[in-house]
Amino acid sequence: PCVKIATAFEPLKRGKNPSIKPDELPEFFDKLINSNTDLLTKYLIQWQLLTMVRPNEAVTAEWTDIDEDKELWVIPAHKMKQTKANENISHIVPLSKQALSLLKKIKSLSSHKSYLFYSSRSRDGYLNSQTANKAIRDNMGYKDRQTAHGMRKIASTYLHEKGVIPDVIEMCL
C-alpha cells in the first residue's frame, strides 16, 4: 500500500517569498546602491534587512515608535501580524548601530513627517508595502529570486547558520 506514497504528496515548491542566500548580500547591496531606485526606497530595503520586519511593519513605522535614546523601535500590536495583534503584544526591535546610522539618513528625508517612509502620493501617508518588491524586481533584477518579505528569510538563515537558538530567532522575527 505504500508503494505509491510519493505520488500522494506534492513536491515542495519554492515559496511565494523567495530569498537569496546570505552570502549573496554583498552583490545585492551593490545592485541596490547602483540601481535607479528612489533614495527613500533604498533606505526602506536596508531598514527591512537590518530590522527583520515584514514589509507592512516597515512602511508603517512612525517616528513616535522610535526611541533613539533606548535604541529601540516599538511596533504597536495593532501594526503586527494578526497573531501578535490578537494578543495585544507590541514587538520590540533593538536597533543596531547600523540601523541607528540608517535612521539618521532616513530622518534627513522624513523627520518632518509622521512616517519614516512617507509618501506624498499615498492617502495613507506612507510608501506602499509593495514598493520594495517593485524595486527589487524591476530595478535590481531579482524577479523570482528575492522579495521584500523574503529578507526575513535571509536573516533567519544567517542566524541559524551562526548557531543562534531557534527560539531566539523566532522572537526576533
Regions found by a protein language model. Give the residues of each.
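Bulky hydrophobic/aromatic "packing anchor" residues in well-ordered structure
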Residues: 1-3, 117, 156
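Short, contiguous acidic/charged loop-to-helix segments that flank catalytic cores in large enzymes
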Residues: 15-17, 33-36, 78-92, 118-124, ...
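Active-site/catalytic core of tyrosine-dependent DNA strand-transfer enzymes
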Residues: 19-26, 70, 96-144, 150, ...
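Short, polar N-cap/turn motifs at the start of nucleic acid-interacting alpha helices
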Residues: 65-72, 143-145, 164-173
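Hydrophobic alpha-helix feature that most strongly marks membrane-spanning transmembrane helices
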Residues: 30-33, 49, 63, 107-111, ...
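C-terminal catalytic core of tyrosine-transesterase DNA break-rejoin enzymes
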Residues: 46, 50-57, 131, 135, ...
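Basic, Lys/Arg- and aromatic-enriched nucleic-acid-binding interface segment
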Residues: 1-61, 69, 109, 151-152
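Conserved tyrosine-mediated DNA breakage-rejoining catalytic core shared by Y-recombinases
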Residues: 2-10, 30, 51, 60-105
